[in-house]
């Protein structure tokens, strides 16, 4: 079974799993330069049910973090995430342009839970999305000094 799915496939799979009494969890992110904070986040999210990852596109990461990002291209980030036992499905977010696109995606998949990290820059958006579909928020603690951006900075300074 393919674990890399588009939105319509995720919607169908979500519906089928919910009909079998399973809970659906959405967790989004860039997951560029995977680190222990990511792993703990995914582990906590997985405790609530079947875990779907909304994986940001390379284009969206460049807009968010700068032209030198991502370090790891989308296809490789998909492969890395699928090697983690906590991850059930990955939805690569190609063509997502704005918050309305995210809202529509969440309303189609209809998760029971949306996982966020404390201090998530999109926390209020995700809380609204959760409210709109009747989902609960799973909030995990951000691990200080553990981020892909920090790792990128360390590597760039090391390589100077």
Predicted regions and their residues:
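Nucleotidyltransferase catalytic core that binds NTPs
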Residues: 1-160
């Amino acid at each position: 079974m393919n674990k890399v799915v588009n939105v319509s496939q995720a919607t169908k799979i979500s519906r089928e799993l919910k009909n079998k009494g399973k809970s659906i969890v959405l967790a989004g992110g860039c997951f560029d330069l995977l680190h222990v904070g990511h792993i703990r986040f995914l582990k906590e999210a997985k405790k609530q049910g079947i875990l779907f990852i909304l994986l940001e596109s390379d284009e969206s990461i460049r807009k968010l973090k700068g032209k030198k990002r991502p370090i790891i291209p989308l296809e490789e980030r998909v492969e890395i995430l699928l090697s983690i036992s906590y991850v059930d499905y990955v939805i690569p977010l190609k063509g997502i342009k704005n918050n309305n696109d995210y809202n529509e995606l969440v309303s189609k998949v209809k998760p029971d839970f949306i996982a966020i990290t404390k201090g998530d820059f999109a926390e209020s958006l995700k809380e609204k999305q959760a409210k709109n579909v009747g989902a609960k928020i799973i909030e995990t603690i951000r691990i200080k000094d553990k981020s892909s951006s920090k790792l990128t900075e360390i590597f760039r300074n090391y390589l100077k």
